[in-house]
Structures are given as C-alpha cells and as structure tokens.
A protein has these predicted regions:
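Residue-level detector of anion-binding/catalytic polar loops
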Residues: 36, 120, 148, 213, ...
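Conserved metal-phosphate-binding beta-hairpin within the catalytic cores
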Residues: 218, 228-229, 288-320, 330
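Active-site nucleotide/adenylate-binding loops and adjacent lid/helix of ATP-dependent enzymes
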Residues: 5-9, 13-14, 20-24, 28, ...
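Glycine-rich phosphate/pyrophosphate-binding beta-alpha loops
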Residues: 102, 188, 246, 315-329
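Phosphate-binding site of ATP-dependent enzymes
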Residues: 192-282, 303-310
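Peripheral (often C-terminal) accessory segments that flank ATP-dependent C-N-forming ligase machineries
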Residues: 168, 269-271, 290-291, 303-305, ...
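ATP-binding N-terminal substructure of ATP-dependent carboxylate-amine bond-forming enzymes
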Residues: 1-122, 126-127, 131-133, 137, ...
C-alpha cells in the first residue's frame, strides 16, 4: 500500500527560492509506485497552499493557488487539512518530508508542529534543528566535545547600546580580518568580512538586520570541505569528503557564490591526505551525535595547510538542488537520490514505531 508523503517547501525565509529548487529534485526522485506524493508550498508571506504538480513549482505559478492546506496539530487525525470552496477535508498523512531551508524551516519551529501532530517526519527533531540553526550555541556544544573551531565572540542586539565596548571585546579576542554572521541564518545571508574597526561596525549593523544574536569569528585560511551524514537511533554513517572551490572573485562562499555564480565548483573526494579525510568524517559523525541529530545533515569544515581540521557549521536540512553537495556525496558512495529518499522516509517511520 502506498504511503501518503507530504512534501513541504518554500517558506518565509531568505532561502525560499533554494527550497523550491530542492523540492523539485526530491519530488522528481520519489518512487510513485511507493508513495502518493502530496505537495504543500509555503509562500514568502506564510500562506500554506496545496500544489498540483512539480511543474507549478518550476514555473512559480503555485504561489497563485487558492486551495489552502496545512498540517493539523490534532493527534487524533494525523492529517493535512485542505480548505477549498468553503469546506474542508482531512487527508491522512503517513510521513512528512520537509524541504525547508533557513528560518522557520530548519530551526525547530515547524518540527515542533510535526511533533504536536505525531506525524513521522524526515530529518532532525526540534532540539537538533534549533541548536544547529544557532551558530553561537552550536559552537558552545562543539567546544564542549573538544573539536577544533575558530575563536568566536557572541554579540547581542542589546550590546548595540554600547557598541564601542562590544567592538573592543571582539578586537581583544579576535585578530582582523573577522567574519561577522547572524547567529540564526542560512546560506551566508547577512555575513560580512571585516578588515578593520569601521568595517566591523558596518558588518555588525548588517548582521543585526537578520538576527538579534551575532557571531564574530576568527578567519580561518584553508580549504572549504564538507561531509554528508545520515543517522538514526543506532548508528551514524558519513560519506567521502567534498570540497568547495569558490569563484576567485568571491570574498568567501556566500549566498551568491553558492547559487548564482557559475565559477564556483564542487569536487567530490578531492586530493588530500587520508588521515585528513578520516578526521573530517569522525568529527562530522561526532557533531551529529552531540546535537542529537537524526536523519540527514551536512557538516562543514576548513582544512588548514598544517593539516588541522576546523569545524565551520552543521546544516540539518542541506540543499537538494542539482548542484548540492549532500546528494552528490551520497551518490559517490553508491546511493542514488531515490534510494536516499527511501532511507530517509524509512528512518522517519521507524522513529515513531
């Protein structure tokens, strides 16, 4: 019997468009012999809509839809509520596959709704999602388990009342250049690189537009590498290493470099010492366990010329676009996207048994 799988995409975050791209990849690779795929898109304004087909996602016409659909928190129904023509119906749901990036998608908020509904869902739970979305608290946890990472200083929105003092504190702990990041934002939105105090001030004002908590971080010079992980209650598996080769004109691998610059490249299983690859995989698995992760995640690192592996960040709902590293790394391990989707759905179902 087919499982009713609700794929939720879009969202009112800065990564709305990337989410739509990821969703098309996921939907096109779902086995329709196994799954009855139901599409729900969330507009940038926060409207939940029933979507007819993947074609509507590709051409953007789904945003003009009129049939509203949302997950009910009523545990006795475990359903999607569909509102149309003044009436409603309940569509039974077996599993939810969220393809939501950034705020309100991978920060634990929508996962909380899924938990209330008691419907199985793909990916990390509330705790792992919330912690991993917050760069400051992720670094606190990673520091606790003894994995190398860049030096950092936490600046709060309230510190702007005495900004000179806050900048003094940052400069005391971290040498220039300094990366300034919103603590809770994805795809490098609001991230700046400051070479001096004037640029630091501007970077802080830019970051606070995106979040009230800001991470000021030491610049690490090294290769940008990533590892895909897949975990459940019993084990965590990791892939070979991937490397990001940002376009030469990009100051760092920001949103435009990731998604809009054809010069940026990804390399699967790049040339590097085997001990470095093993260290990256071990650290990636350890970090997923430390944040209580489940299902899919991608863990990013820097590899310094000295051979030191430095943690950068964890992404609990990594991109699934045609150029995304997560599915590419699993494919290199012999796991194609349809099989990967099957595993993620099976894991979600098993978690609730």
């Amino acid at each position: 019997m087919k499982k009713n799988v609700v794929v939720i995409f879009g969202g009112d975050s800065s990564e709305h468009d990337v989410s739509c791209l990821s969703a098309t990849t996921v939907i096109k690779n779902m086995d329709t012999e196994k799954y009855n795929v139901i599409l729900v898109g969330i507009t940038k304004e926060g409207k939940w809509l029933l979507v007819d087909s993947v074609k509507d996602i590709e051409d953007g016409s789904w945003r003009e839809g009129e049939v509203k659909a949302f997950i009910s928190p009523d545990t006795t129904t475990r359903s999607l509520v569909i509102l149309a023509e003044g009436t409603y119906k309940l569509q039974k749901v077996d599993v939810i596959f969220p393809v939501l990036h950034g705020m309100n998608g991978e920060d634990g908020t929508v996962q909380g709704l899924f938990e209330l509904s008691k419907i199985p869902y793909v990916g990390c739970g509330v705790l792992a999602s919330a912690v991993s979305m917050d760069k400051v608290y992720t670094k606190i946890i990673v520091d606790h388990i003894g994995i190398d990472q860049a030096k950092f200083v936490h600046v709060r929105e309230s510190d702007f009342e005495h900004l000179d003092e806050a900048m003094d504190r940052v400069e005391k702990e971290i040498p220039y250049p300094i990366f300034v990041k919103p603590s809770c934002a994805g795809s490098s939105k609001g991230v700046s690189k400051a070479e001096n105090r004037k640029e630091l001030e501007a970077a802080l004002y830019e970051a606070v537009k995106h979040d009230r908590n800001i991470l000021c971080e030491e610049t690490i010079v090294g290769r940008e590498v990533e590892c895909a992980v897949l975990g459940d209650r019993t084990q965590v598996k990791s892939t070979c290493v991937g490397e990001i080769l940002a376009a030469q004109e990009a100051a760092f691998y920001d949103f435009d470099a990731k998604y809009n610059n054809a010069e940026s490249k990804t390399v699967v299983d790049p040339d590097m010492p085997e001990e470095s690859k093993q260290k990256i995989r071990e650290d990636a698995e350890a970090i997923l366990k430390a944040v209580d992760g489940f299902g899919l995640s991608r863990v990013d690192f820097f590899l310094e010329e000295s051979g030191r592996v430095v943690f950068n960040e964890i992404n609990t709902l990594p991109g699934f676009t045609s150029i995304s590293m997560y599915p590419m790394l699993w494919k290199a391990c012999g796991l194609d996207i349809p099989e990967l989707i099957d595993i993620l759905i099976d894991q979600a179902m098993t978690r609730y048994r």
